[in-house]
């Protein structure tokens, strides 16, 4: 019934107009699972490898025909006839077939596309939603959204060094109310930026990308928008940052090009602690560079008891790197990006390890996305309590929010919104 009879890979476009991989997995009973693979702009050096063609005469070298050929050829040859219910074994076969530590030969984009499509096909075969198939009967928690409403860094053409300024509607009673809160703040922010003479073009993740001089300026606009929209900062809505500090870490220091300032490792830790003291910031992602291990420890020691410190480039959804961070007291949370590691099995293992160690986990999109909403289901399946999937604009972002609305409606009275319980500092 659930034997794999066909695997079809194709090249499609992501939200930035770059090629990416889409995969259909067809089962013996006619069930079909489809998955499209995202792509990042600020990528960690330790991520699994995204296979690109390198032919400059086609899509500027970013084509994914090699990955598609691997899907339709070598990978299908190995997986054809296997049972789609055997997710772990299927993922293990692909990892072994690739034979490299970072999936560089066949490509994490090829392997992930199949891995996710297999799970979706199996869920379809059982006539179950994906969150229920992956998460079982306990999957019922709707995540607090981290809504990226001001973009900077690698996600926008403006002087702001930090990559994302986010709102978290922790005070809402339901996911649908949280989404409404975020949307109202988003539109209020647009009006406030316009009034102040700033452009309201949006960045890669749907947030605004105004020419603001500093993080303080961006945070002040967000605070004003929250209040003007009728909500209380620090009570109804909290703030979160993604510094993406690896991008401006040079020669052992943090170089703020937009502010024309350089901060030492200790100054960076103190600066972030100061921001968290002056604003209702409850989560800071990648506040230190991916290889600045001393900096991560210092930051965790200073603010880790009061603030969620999320490792993205630091951990790259990799259990080996996460285990090292847990052992050495670096960060207290992990960002979960399926394409950083390349299989569903390894993704779920990272969430499980984090939860067992008392770390939180945040399910996340990438800046180059598609209409695929798999991560919405995975957020509920893992009961991780937080999701980061962009702003309240662009269909590649709202597709995930809309899927969460559907899931909440389907769960009915069983649905539970994570709210303040998602963040240890607010419990």
From Swiss-Prot:
Its cofactor is Mg(2+). Its EC number is 4.2.1.11. One of its GO terms (biological process) is glycolytic process. Mg(2+) binds at residues 242, 285, 312. One of its GO terms (molecular function) is magnesium ion binding. Keywords: Cytoplasm, Glycolysis, Lyase, Magnesium, Metal-binding, Secreted. It is found in: Cytoplasm; Secreted; Cell surface. InterPro entries: Enolase (IPR000941), Enolase-like_C_sf (IPR036849), Enolase-like_N (IPR029017), Enolase_C (IPR020810), Enolase_CS (IPR020809), Enolase_N (IPR020811). The active site is at 205 (proton donor), 337 (proton acceptor). It catalyses: (2R)-2-phosphoglycerate = phosphoenolpyruvate + H2O. Pfam families: Enolase_C (PF00113), Enolase_N (PF03952). Gene3D superfamilies: Enolase-like C-terminal domain, Enolase-like, N-terminal domain. The keyword tRNA-binding does not apply. It comes from the Bacteria. One of its GO terms (cellular component) is extracellular region. (2R)-2-phosphoglycerate binds at residues 163, 337, 366-367, 388. It is an enzyme of class 4 (lyase). Belongs to the enolase family. NCBIfam families: eno. Catalyzes the reversible conversion of 2-phosphoglycerate (2-PG) into phosphoenolpyruvate (PEP). It is essential for the degradation of carbohydrates via glycolysis. HAMAP family: Enolase. This is Enolase.
């Amino acid at each position: 019934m659930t034997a794999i009879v066909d695997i079809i890979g194709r090249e499609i476009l992501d939200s930035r107009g770059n090629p990416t991989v889409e995969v259909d997995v067809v089962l013996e009973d006619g069930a079909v699972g489809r998955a499209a693979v995202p792509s990042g702009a600020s990528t960690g050096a330790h991520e699994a490898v995204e296979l690109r063609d390198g032919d400059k005469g086609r899509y500027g070298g970013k084509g994914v025909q090699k990955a598609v050929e691997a899907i339709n050829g070598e990978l299908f040859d190995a997986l054809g006839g296997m049972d789609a219910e055997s997710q772990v074994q299927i993922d293990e076969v692909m990892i072994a077939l690739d034979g490299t530590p970072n999936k560089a030969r066949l490509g994490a984009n090829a392997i992930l596309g199949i891995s996710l499509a297999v799970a979706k096909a199996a869920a379809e075969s059982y006539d179950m939603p994906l969150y229920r198939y992956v998460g079982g009967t306990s999957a019922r928690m709707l995540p607090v959204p981290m809504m990226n409403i001001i973009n900077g860094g690698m996600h926008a053409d403006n002087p702001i060094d930090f990559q994302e300024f986010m709102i978290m509607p922790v005070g809402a009673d339901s996911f649908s109310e949280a989404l409404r809160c975020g949307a109202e703040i988003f539109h209020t922010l647009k009006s406030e930026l316009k009034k102040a003479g700033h452009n309201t073009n949006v960045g890669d993740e749907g947030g605004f990308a105004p020419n603001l001089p500093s993080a303080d300026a961006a945070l002040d606009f967000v605070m004003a928008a929250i209040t003007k929209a009728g909500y209380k900062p620090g009570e109804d809505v909290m703030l979160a940052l993604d510094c993406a500090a690896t991008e401006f870490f040079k020669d052992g220091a943090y170089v703020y090009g937009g502010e024309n300032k350089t901060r030492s490792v200790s100054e960076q830790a103190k600066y972030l602690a100061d921001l968290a003291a002056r604003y209702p910031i409850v989560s800071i992602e990648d506040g230190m560079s991916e290889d600045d291990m001393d900096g991560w420890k210092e930051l965790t020691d200073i603010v880790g008891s009061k603030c969620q410190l999320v490792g993205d480039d630091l951990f790259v959804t990799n259990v080996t790197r996460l285990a090292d961070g847990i052992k050495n007291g670096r960060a207290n949370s992990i960002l979960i990006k399926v394409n950083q590691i390349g299989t569903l099995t390894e993704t779920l293992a990272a969430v499980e390890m984090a939860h067992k160690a008392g770390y939180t986990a945040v399910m996340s999109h990438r800046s180059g996305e598609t209409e695929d909403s798999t991560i919405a289901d995975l957020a509920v399946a893992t009961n991780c309590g937080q999701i980061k999937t962009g702003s309240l604009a662009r269909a590649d972002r709202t597709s995930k929010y809309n899927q969460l609305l559907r899931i909440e409606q389907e769960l009915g009275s069983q649905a539970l919104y994570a709210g303040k319980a998602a963040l240890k500092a607010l419990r």
